[in-house]
Amino acid sequence: MEKQSSEELSIENKSAGFSRVEKPKVAEIQLQLLPYDVLRDILSRLSIKDVVRMSTLSGEWRQQRICHPDLVFTKDTFGISTDPDPDFTKTINAIIRDTDAKRASWTAEFIFNVESVLRPLWSTSTTTTTTLDKFAVEFGLRRKHKYYIDRWVSFSIASRAKHIAFDFTFDVDCAGPGCDQYKDVFPLCKLSGPSGSCVTSLVLGYVWLKLPPSFCGITNLRKLTLKTVSISEGDLQCLLLSCALLEHINIEWCSPLSSLRIGQELCRLQYLRVRRSELEMLELHAPNLTKFEFDEDLAQIVLSDCLRLSEATFVSNMRTQEFNDYDFDDLAFTFTELALPHVQKLFLLLNLDQVCSRK
């Protein structure tokens, strides 16, 4: 074997010496020196999934207590697989038990992960170290998870989030009035008054809304979406009237509703969508309404003073049927009962392939 040259030995010794020198904690030093706004900007350029992964792996990031401006928690955020993969060799009861056990495991994993992200951001039990633009939880939570739901609602308010969503319609295994017992009674009162003054957009799914007498509205709410929400006609009317700045309302699969009459003027309302809610009668005054979407459940519609209504869209609940299967006599009766004298365009979505329009 050839002898190493003196130059090679020198390089080798230097490398060995460098390896023994403790490397400075560059990442930690940089994080401590960078301004808060710069760190926040770095996080905002990443997906929430990447931020969660980075926070898990890096203690330095956790110590900074800096949060992504949009916290959107779904099963995909944490890579939770929700495929039940049933064993069809078992009995029906055994399959149901297995599915329930898996669902409980998914939910426990989801709650643990959300708590792991939020826990470092609490400075006290009622205040946080961060401000958010959006806070969303989209998972199949139920009334038995109320402790965490209420805690996360409090966090979203304390962080002054503008856009809040608690959509629990994922993996719904029970629908209808008999399933109200599984829905969380959502603490809407926490958003009422000054505490919810930052909220401009609210999405609620698979919850039960009961307005307390002290409810005084969500001051700056402009966009409201209710999906599979249990709410009485009186509470819905009170909710809409108490949010004076509402511009966009979306109501779908809500119950038990048969009619909605609002005598007072919704002067800011521009968009209204009512679908799959068995709401037979709708009457409201919205002078600035421009777009309206509805289905055949609405047998009577009275939109008084809607002089700016430029577009109305009828979406049939039987769109999966063949076009020739429609009972056009019933459809004609539906439209003779409508009071849309000022609409400029009426779109009829009758099945998946056809859109009929009348100008």
Question: Where are these predicted regions, by residue range?
Answer:
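Terminal membrane/secretory targeting segments in land-plant proteins
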Residues: 1-24
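Leucine-rich repeat
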Residues: 2, 21-255, 261-263
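C-terminal per-repeat helix/turn "cap" of leucine-rich repeat
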Residues: 214-217, 236-239, 262, 282-285, ...
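Short "repeat-start/strand-capping" segments in structured domains, especially the N-termini
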Residues: 219-220, 244-247, 265-270, 285-288, ...
